Amino acid sequence: MEQTPDLAQFFNPRSIAIVGVSTRPGSISGQFLAYLTRFGYKGQIYPVNPRHQEVAGRPCYGRLADIPDNVDLCLIVTPKQAVRATVVECAEKKVPYVVIPAAGFGEAGPEGAKVQEELMAIARTSHMRLVGPNCMGFINFKERVALSFGGFLADVENLAGGNVAFVSQSGAFGGGMVRRCLKEGIGFTYHVSTGNEADLDALDFMEYYIEDPDTRVIGAFIEGIKDASRLVAVGRKARLSGKVIVVLKGGKSARGAQAVGSHTGRIAGSADVYRGIFAQAGMIEVASARELSAALETLSQVNFAPPCYAVAAVVASGGSGILASDYCEVLGLSFPELSQKTQSALSSLVPEAGSCANPVDITAQVPHNEIQKLPSIIDLVCKEEGVGVIMLSIANLHLERCWREVLEIVGASGRLLAVGSSGGLSGPTRRELAKSGRAIVGEDVWDALQKVAFVVKRQGLNHKTEWLAPSVRCGKHDHHALPAPAGGVLTEHQAKRLLAPYLQMPRGKLASSIGEAVGIADEFGYPVVLKLVAPGLLHKTESGAVKLHIDSPDSLAKSFAELMERAPAVAGQLHGVLVEEQVERGTEVILGFLRKPELGPLVMFGSGGILVELIRDVSYRSLPAGREDLAGMVRETLSYKLLRGFRNQPAGDVEGLLDLMTEASALFLANPWMKELEFNPIVVLPAGRGVRALDVVLTT
């Protein structure tokens, strides 16, 4: 379904019918009813089951049609064999929303997928929206609507609200994450489990969360997506709305992707692909459930920006100081040495055995015997102009005695306080620090600094200009559909002849004899390159089908003859020998395009040449992509260091490279018959001298 609905009625239904409700203790349907009742749902609940007259003190109806009133939402908890018939009843009753927890549909194989599509056909014709199948429902914390099941709510006393909204394609993971966050004091606005996403999907709910005024941070567990370009649009919409999406992706490894396929029927893309798409969308990607909860906690509580994010550590242990320095480097945080002026002022307060540089090592003496000095030490560090974050690591027993004064000093200076002590602060102290909005509390030094890094990432995204840029710039040419050649892989000569009017490539012509080849070389000028051209001949270097550095007619004749001797072993139907002008040396990169059914068109960039598959230095984006998106790809790779000029080598023509990337992107989008398009290598010449695509593989 194309248009995302207003989900306000879904999250806050005036009436809910539970079809298939059971009186059996501990049943899934019974848990749905119990949680709705226990957490204070204010609307009408209609149990439906022909076997019962009454359920939990409520009248039970034999059929959905017997309910005398309108039903805003129907929860179907029947066996899967009865789900289709119940969906038909929902359509006849004009129920706008249906939730289907049952498994055994699209994730279970072709037969299940067929039934799932039948459910969707019914929903489409009746303008009904589905959540699931294979889901665990949802929770509206603001209105206390707990339409869910499972043990994750068993010991939750009340649905305390907050500013985090969560969506999970895995029901069990989502429930576990909600439970974990609630125990850590993180409050929610909404949580939904989307399951197979036959209709409404994670992006639909993210869009609703973005519009919700009470939601500041959106968390997501994603196994796979249907439309990468839409994910990018949703992520950017969130950033423009002042909100951030934190995402944990499951199914990154080959085995993980296989598990995703069996779990929900999705095809999971590689980690590299999703990493690039999340970056393009302005989402913060995390690597574990622990990181996810840490990011949600931090970003929901800290909502101000210090003057900078350079870290100064005040520690009572040399080991903690060493770790702080190491961790800052890993996390990309600046850890500057303090000025001589600050160090001189600190020397009268810091014990002789300590250190006044960064980290400031106050030793065990200050916490144990001179705790009254700590606020003054913190005050001096806060006055350091190039510092924005104060990382404090002392035993919690001592911090409990002075944290209010420390927080007041740090807050007054406009800095951010990060507490990274081993063990945990008392609950009240932790809550007070969190409530301030100017402090981060970590279980240890790493935890505290990683949380600082999350704030830095959010701030960096806030300053990105490409969020306001158009999604794609078509380049210098008005690209129209090119004539689609016959299916399969084009030869290099065919592909270059098709693309040469739009992209920078070496001049080249096809020769069938030594005489023709010499004539072409005389036209271009030496040196030249010779390549065998034949259908299916892709990796010419490995096949011995290319000759370089040919600088004379005699050398050309010899190389031509050697290639013709080689041809029967590597080329079936030989089209000839491609004679090209040889391009001077430069930085070699790869640029590729592909279409994935579950993601749409993608662009890939990285270090090129014959080692591309070995070093895997690549970055991805979804198409369409603007010039700034493409520039971000380039900056993410190791090749960018070479392009900027490495070890006295001249800087490469990055602007020329971006011109080619933009043109090629527009060409690929304008011609859906192109399944894959790869340029490897592209030689980036020194700044101002352009680029050349030396080899092309085009698959139709």
Can you say where each PLM-predicted feature lies in the sequence?
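Catalytic-core regions of core metabolic enzymes
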Residues: 1-700
